[in-house]
């Protein structure tokens, strides 16, 4: 890549907005607080900290949902703010160039909107790359003739792709991801423990289950019937049971991709293993469940949720593989 203008890789996820340039990677909560007139009052970590504490005249908005832009002007404003925050100073973005990760399932209109968000944020030139192809590069398996099966567990979608020679040959997607678990945990706590918990507490319990060695996890909430503050407990076994539908989704997706792939590539996957990435890749017990269910190696990519944006940055130097908007 050249050095005269700023270069950046972008992954506009539903939960996190990720950037990568020649210096480092950044990750911001992809959320904003807007008032009744639609004016931006807070974004990123500041907005997330205000969730559940807002007065009636303010509301929390996520500009990207299930990988698709739901609010183009707001998405552009947040991206512009993130780019300026990452630059370390409020300089203009004139002449900046970017490569943006585009979901494999995106329609031509959705791809156009993603590029438009980048341009409205101040990016001069935008190139795009399929999310699975970027992830393959980030996982270190791009360009190889051997087959690689990557599974992206996002906030609201889970996708599995067979990659060979830097191309996604087969992709399957389900509209359910790690974020679904939070809603299920909230419902489970309410129905089984008469405890009302928020999305943040549910997410904390989900993540703690992956690290906790004990059998029980304390959770703070409100008594469902009286509304008084209450500290309850969820067992690791309960959380794992709530996670099971996601496990089963991933297993079905992997099986569907293997069934639709040439036998030579399937053999490669049985030797190399399935590669998990995305924000939900480290869900408690997921890799172990898949190893048992699929009878093959399963690995969590070290870069996790940053795999695609890291790969997009690596691919950006190979301009011909990217589509110029």
What label would you give each PLM region?
Residues 1-150, 163-274, 281-308, 313-325:
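Nucleotide/phosphate-binding catalytic cleft detector across ATP-hydrolyzing
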Residues 159-161:
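A structural feature that tracks compact, well-ordered secondary-structure segments
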């Amino acid at each position: 890549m050249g050095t005269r203008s700023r270069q950046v890789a972008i992954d506009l996820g539903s939960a996190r907005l990720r950037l990568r340039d020649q210096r480092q990677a950044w990750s911001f909560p992809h959320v904003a607080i807007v008032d009744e007139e639609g004016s931006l009052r807070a974004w990123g970590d500041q907005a997330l900290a205000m969730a559940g504490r807002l007065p009636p005249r303010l509301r929390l908005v996520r500009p990207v949902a299930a990988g698709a832009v739901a609010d183009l002007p707001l998405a552009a404003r947040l991206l512009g703010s993130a780019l300026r925050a990452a630059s370390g100073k409020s300089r203009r973005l004139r002449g900046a160039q970017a490569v943006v990760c585009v979901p494999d399932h995106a329609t031509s209109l959705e791809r156009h909107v993603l590029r438009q968000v980048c341009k409205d944020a101040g990016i001069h030139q935008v190139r795009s790359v399929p999310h699975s192809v970027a992830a393959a590069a980030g996982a270190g398996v791009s360009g190889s003739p051997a087959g690689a099966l990557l599974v992206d567990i996002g906030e609201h979608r889970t996708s599995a792709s067979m990659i060979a020679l830097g191309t996604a040959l087969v992709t399957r997607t389900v509209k359910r991801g790690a974020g679904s678990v939070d809603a299920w945990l909230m419902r489970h706590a309410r129905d089984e423990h008469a405890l009302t918990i928020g999305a943040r507490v549910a997410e904390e319990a989900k993540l703690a289950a992956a690290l906790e060695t004990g059998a029980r996890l304390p959770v703070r909430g409100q008594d469902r019937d009286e509304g008084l503050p209450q500290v309850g407990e969820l067992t690791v076994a309960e959380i794992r049971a709530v996670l099971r539908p996601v496990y089963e989704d991933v297993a079905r997706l992997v099986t569907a991709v293997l069934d639709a792939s040439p036998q030579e590539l399937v053999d490669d996957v049985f030797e190399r293993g399935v590669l998990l990435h995305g924000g939900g890749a480290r869900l408690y017990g997921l890799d172990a469940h898949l190893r048992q269910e699929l009878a093959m190696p399963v690995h969590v990519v070290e870069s996790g949720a940053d795999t695609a944006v890291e790969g997009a940055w690596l691919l950006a130097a190979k301009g011909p593989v990217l589509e110029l908007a």
